[in-house]
Amino acid sequence: QVLVLDGRGHLLGRLAAIVAKQVLLGRKVVVVRCEGINISGNFYRNKLKYLAFLRKRMNTNPSRGPYHFRAPSRIFWRTVRGMLPHKTKRGQAALDRLKVFDGIPPPYDKKKRMVVPAALKVVRLKLTGKFXYLGRL
């Protein structure tokens, strides 16, 4: 059974942690609307952190990595990868069970999309708390 999650209004790290646990347990997880995922902290601060990440590269041959994905779905995918033992067979199999999309592509637009209450912004941040959208980053 495939778990279809709607990323909009969820916090990046909390959603990623829950998704990572589920794929390790053997569930297939699909996350749609990754551009609507929230990150706590204001946009300027998150932008500085992301730009600092963009500066990290291999001096001798930058094309060998680290790879800096710009698309919101890939940023989320990488966040989940950091929570998995992705260099082991088990971790790779878990990553294969995860699919991420910006927007809602055809097979999933008809399916029921779930939310994760533990990762929702409205639950976790104060009403005045600052946050940024992954899509803007």
UniProtKB/Swiss-Prot annotation:
- Sites where Phosphoserine occurs are at 73
Record note on modification: Phosphorylation at Ser-73 upon interferon-gamma treatment in macrophages involves a DAPK1-DAPK3 kinase cascade and is causing release from the ribosome, association with the GAIT complex and subsequent involvement in transcript-selective translation inhibition.
Q: Which residues carry this modification: Citrulline?
A: 55, 136
Q: Which GO terms describe its molecular function?
A: mRNA binding; structural constituent of ribosome
Query: In its keyword annotation, does this UniProt entry include Isomerase?
Result: no
Tell me which UniProt keywords the record has, alphabetically.
Answer: Citrullination, Cytoplasm, Phosphoprotein, Ribonucleoprotein, Ribosomal protein, Translation regulation
Gene Ontology CC:
cytosolic large ribosomal subunit; GAIT complex; ribosome
Q: Which compartment or compartments is the protein found in? A: Cytoplasm
Gene Ontology BP, a term: negative regulation of formation of translation preinitiation complex
HAMAP family, per this entry? Ribosomal_uL13
Oligomer status and interactors: Component of the 60S ribosome. Component of the GAIT complex. Interacts with EIF4G1.
Query: Which family, according to UniProt?
Result: Belongs to the universal ribosomal protein uL13 family.
In Swiss-Prot or TrEMBL terms, this protein is called Large ribosomal subunit protein uL13
> What organism does the UniProt record list as the source?
Sus scrofa (Pig)
